[in-house]
Structure formats: structure tokens, C-alpha cells
């Protein structure tokens, strides 16, 4: 089947009908070969504008998905095996799982061409649950991950109409809004307050009065320095109340709460020229939408701090072996001071020379305090030979000190 599928690929764009027939021939030879199977399904949907072919896909999908998953587990054909597994989940009616696998594919991509497109299935997009979510995410991710190699494509034309650009840095507060968990989530209010205390930039959340989103609105009303933006669907469920304490509420075109809300905030961020590395996410519990939000942020290169013990999707992410090695994922204790340090803005008015000079002084003071121990501890080395991560630790201490001074009005 590999040889036939390769031949089919050579006909793509030259004689698509010939390519389509060859893809069918290839998967008939080996029904477990996911590459020709998915290409045949894409071609049928593109040709007919309907999803009738999925009746054929469903019975044979399990073996092809098992082979695809086996490739993922041993790191074969990455990111294509990841995106193929995502496509199976999408076509078989599990869009939330599809989003998670697509996020892994986005994270693994080393070029814009390695991020898949759903162009061939758009003819039947309204017949495939969650197709719009996945399509929008992939278009946005291609630009966000590879801004210098991609033109401002369709994702660049879909920011919130008439909305001003978002100013960085950006803090996204995500997590539980389930009223049944209100009492438990209330215990995390000090963490949200600590995250927003002194934060200067833009804070984004869900824009309702429920759960962590409502905490953002309430804290904003007390005079927070940051500008707050809430994203919520135009067709808001009856049990959800918009929070007018936000500085701005932006509507998405979703029906009820969906991944379109966090996707739209990322589309707006990218359209505003915000680098994902300048975005910090604070995650507290949450359901399926939060699970998507955490993984999209990690895939794009944001820092995601997830509060340990907050349950549900936050806990599942921290236990997910596919994500635990993500550079941006940081497990956070339920401690306000740690959360504040995690989201803190680096002091902008302190020059790099002054910042390093203060860090050197802190390090020398530390060396002086422990000089009598004559330890071989690498942390006792002179600044010039100190490991980079230990230098960064001293620089972070400087940032924290300067930030605390700024909070009490001390001009540095």
C-alpha cells in the first residue's frame, strides 16, 4: 500500500481523480494504513460535499487508528501521525479529542507545512461537529508558530471586528466556571487576586460572573492596573451572566460556550502582534474547554501555570505524559506568593546592565554568607563561571525585589 499511496501523492494537483482512485486502491490493499485511508476520505468529502463516506470509514477506523497510535507512541512519522489521529477523532465525532491531538501536532511541527490543513473537508464543514474549531485553530497556529514564513492568511482576517489591538504582556485566567463547584473554586480567589495584583498589561478570561471568570471581573472592579477583556459567545446560555465589570467584552460566533471563545482570544492576540512567549496562562481546574485552552497555549509557546490539586482538567494535564515535558508547563502550588511571582511582569524600566549588576551583588552576598562551608556546591561559584540557570535565578530575585518595591510606590 505504501508504494500505491506514494504514487497517488505524485498525482495530487496533476490528476486529482487519478490520485483519488489510487488512494482507494492503497487502503483496500491495507485497511490499517491510515495515510491513504484519510486521503481517500478527504477526497470523497471534497468531491461530494457530504460526509456519506464516513459510513465507510467508521467500521475500518479502529485498526487504522490503532496503527496510527502505535506510531505516535514510538515517535514514528511525527507530526503526521499526531495530526492523522486528530483527523480520525474529528471525523468520528470527538472534536475535543481532535483539538488535543492537533495541539500536539502543532507543538511538534518544525515548519508551516507540517501544520495540517482542513481545506479539503471544508465543503462539508457544517456536517462535521467541531470542524470550525479545528480549522480555525490550525490556521491561527500556522501564523503564530511561523510568523516569518507565513503570509497573513485567513486567521489574520478574523480578529474581533472593530476591537482595538491588545497590549501586552498578557495574562489569561482559565479554569472552572461550573456553578456546582462554586464553593471549591472560591478557595482559589486569593490566587487570582495575587496574579492580578500589580500586573500591568491585559488580563483575559471568560467574561461571565461564574467561577474564575467572575473573580477576574470582581478584582478588576477594585482598581486593578491591567485592562480586562472577556470572551463569551453571542448566544449565551440562560444560566450564564455577562460580567460588565470587565473593561471590554468581546462576542464570538459560537452557540453556547465552546473552544471558539479561547480560540478567538488567540486570534486577536496574534493579530495584535503579541508573541505567545509574552503570554502567561493561570489554570485552575476546568472542563473540556479549559483542557483545550491549556494545550493551545502550550502548543504556541506560552507559559502555562496549572494549580496543583485544583482538579479536573488541570490535574489531567499535569498527569498527561504527552505534555509533562512541555517547556512552558509549570505546576504551581496553591500559594498566592508563588502565583504572583509566576505571572509577574519583568520590570521594564530597569536596564539590563543595572539588572545584572544587582544580580551579581545578590550572588556575592550569598557567597559571603556561606563562604565558611567551603562546599563544592555549584551555586557558590563566581558569577563568571556560574551556570546559566543559577544566574537566571539571581536575575529573577532582582525582578521580584524591584516588583515589590514598585507595588508600594518606591521609584527605582
Language-model segment annotations:
Residues 117-147:
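Terminal, low-structured helical/coil segments at or just beyond the last alpha-helical repeat
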Residues 1-39, 43-48, 54, 58, ...:
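Acidic/glycine-enriched connector segments
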Amino acid at each position: 500500500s505504501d508504494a500505491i499511496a506514494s504514487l497517488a501523492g505524485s498525482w495530487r494537483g496533476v490528476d486529482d481523480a487519478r490520485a483519488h482512485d489510487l488512494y482507494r486502491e492503497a487502503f483496500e490493499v491495507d485497511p490499517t494504513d491510515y495515510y491513504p485511508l484519510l486521503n481517500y476520505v478527504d477526497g470523497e468529502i471534497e468531491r461530494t460535499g457530504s460526509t456519506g463516506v464516513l459510513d465507510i470509514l467508521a467500521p475500518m477506523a479502529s485498526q487504522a487508528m490503532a496503527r496510527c497510535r502505535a506510531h505516535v507512541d514510538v515517535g514514528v512519522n511525527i507530526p503526521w501521525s499526531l495530526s492523522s489521529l486528530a483527523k480520525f477523532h474529528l471525523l468520528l465525532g470527538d472534536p475535543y479529542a481532535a483539538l488535543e491531538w492537533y495541539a500536539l501536532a502543532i507543538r511538534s511541527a518544525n515548519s508551516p507545512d507540517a501544520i495540517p490543513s482542513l481545506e479539503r473537508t471544508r465543503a462539508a464543514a457544517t456536517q462535521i461537529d467541531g470542524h470550525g474549531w479545528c480549522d480555525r485553530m490550525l490556521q491561527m497556529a500556522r501564523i503564530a508558530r511561523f510568523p516569518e514564513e507565513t503570509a497573513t492568511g485567513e486567521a489574520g482576517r478574523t480578529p474581533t471586528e472593530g476591537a482595538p489591538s491588545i497590549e501586552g504582556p498578557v495574562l489569561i485566567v482559565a479554569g472552572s466556571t461550573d456553578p456546582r463547584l462554586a464553593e471549591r473554586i472560591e478557595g482559589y480567589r486569593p490566587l487570582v487576586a495575587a496574579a492580578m495584583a500589580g500586573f500591568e498589561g491585559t488580563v483575559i478570561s471568560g467574561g461571565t460572573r461564574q467561577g474564575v471568570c467572575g473573580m477576574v471581573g470582581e478584582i478588576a472592579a477594585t482598581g486593578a492596573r491591567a485592562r480586562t477583556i472577556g470572551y463569551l459567545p453571542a448566544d449565551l446560555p440562560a444560566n450564564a451572566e455577562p460580567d460588565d465589570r470587565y473593561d471590554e467584552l468581546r462576542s464570538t460566533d459560537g452557540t453556547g460556550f465552546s473552544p471558539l471563545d479561547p480560540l478567538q482570544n488567540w486570534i486577536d492576540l496574534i493579530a495584535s502582534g503579541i508573541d505567545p512567549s509574552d503570554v502567561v496562562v493561570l489554570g485552575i481546574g476546568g472542563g473540556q474547554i479549559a483542557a483545550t485552552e491549556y494545550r493551545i497555549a502550550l502548543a504556541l509557546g506560552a507559559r502555562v501555570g496549572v494549580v496543583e490539586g485544583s482538579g479536573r482538567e488541570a490535574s489531567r494535564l499535569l498527569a498527561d505524559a504527552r505534555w509533562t515535558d512541555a517547556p512552558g508547563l509549570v505546576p504551581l502550588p496553591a500559594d498566592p506568593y508563588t502565583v504572583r511571582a509566576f505571572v509577574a511582569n519583568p520590570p521594564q524600566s530597569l536596564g539590563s546592565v543595572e539588572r545584572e549588576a544587582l544580580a551579581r551583588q545578590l550572588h556575592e552576598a550569598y557567597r559571603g554568607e556561606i563562604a565558611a562551608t567551603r562546599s563544592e556546591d555549584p551555586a557558590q561559584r563566581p558569577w563568571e563561571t556560574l551556570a546559566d540557570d543559577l544566574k537566571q535565578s539571581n536575575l529573577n530575585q532582582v525582578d521580584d525585589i524591584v516588583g515589590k518595591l514598585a507595588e508600594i510606590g518606591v521609584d527605582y
